Every structure is written in C-alpha cells, then in structure tokens.
C-alpha cells in the first residue's frame, strides 16, 4: 500500500508541475468575456439522519439540488447530466452527487491514484470567498469508489501535488452505487451516485471549531470527468457547477459562494 501511495503522489506531482502532460486539468483554455452566472448555494442543516450508503434517502430529498452544471470554458450544457446536494450537521459536511452515465468506466483502484483518468466526481471547497482564500481541499472519487483526497495550504505557491497528496481526511466516509456494469462497453448503463461525509475535525482550518457559524461563507464547486463511447467522437466531457472561465478545476478564484444555514 505504501508503494502504491508513493506512486500515486509522485504521478500527481509530475502532473501538477508539468513533467508529464497527460493531466487535462493543466489545459488552460480561456474565453475573452466569461458569460457564466455565479450562483450561490445554501448548505442547509441535514433535515434527518444521513447514512452514507451511496443512495438518495429521504433526508437527501429535502435538500435543495444543485443542477447548474456547464462545460468550461464556453459554458455549454453538458450531455451527461449531474446533480449535487450539500448539507451538514454537528459532525460532518455531507455531499451527494448523482450522475447520468451511459458508459461506466473506472480502473484506478489504489488510494490517491489518478482517478481523473476514470469516470470521476469531484468536490472542491475553500474557507471563504474564492479570491480571498489561499487554502482549499479537493476530493476526486471514481465510479469504482477509489478515493483521492488532497489539501492545498497555499495556492500562491503553485500546485504541489506531492505535498497535497500527503494529507489524509481522517474519518472520511464515502460510498458509491452504480446502475449499470462497470467497464463493460457493450451495454448501456444508467449512471452512478457518490455520497461522502467529511468530518469537521479533519478539515485543517476548522481546528478549535465544531462547525461553521450560521451565515458563514465558504466557496466550492462540484466537478466531473465523464468518459463515454456515447459522447461525440468518443471524447471525454468535463463539467462543473461553478462558472470556470478555463478548463482548470483548481481555479479557486471562480469557486461559487457557499453559505451555511442552521
């Protein structure tokens, strides 16, 4: 496991520093006048007990859905639809992501591996308005359930994949369910669901605090890589819930506002 962990970290470090070129998130295609609308999301208190099992239970149905996904940089509507929900209680920050997917694909099976090469759902968040925030966290979990977690303490120093990869979200709960057959291109699938619970005590900037205050502002976005033979020319589709002006999911300046509500 240690060897695989080191391999994952080394590979990620190379991707982020440019010594290899297969990380598509390094492609910074920009448009002159971004037209995406910045939509704020309210993180409500969980209306009931949330069991992390990768399913849309009754508690989740009462949480507002985030449906405004688009494909950067031109803000096109994704072919593969995604829906996200976010809630909290005294112990955890919860996320549920439901993805339509006709061709489920994932091969990365070791922790902190290159899950972006697979069908993957991602959650990025930072402790304040994006332009004023240095640190952030991202989770990238593939359709197999493999977890990549990273903490970036100071984004002004660049993307240090090796250091970010060393952080582990202690006590993280995650679950994936699929409607379809993984890695079977001859059939047509329906999609998959990811559910995670991030302990407040595991978040570096929450030391000494139990949970965010009522009305506190953070920033975030949900993101996705979808690889499918059913997409035009069989290419991948990248989408986000934030108006990113370039194909770069780590663009903290353009994370969307997230307000906590009791």
Give residue ranges: language-model regions:
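Structural preference for beta-rich elements and adjacent junctions enriched in aromatics
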Residues: 20-262
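Bacterial N-terminal signal peptides that target proteins for export
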Residues: 1-8
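Bacterial N-terminal signal peptides
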Residues: 8-18
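Low-complexity intrinsically disordered segments
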Residues: 1, 14, 24-27
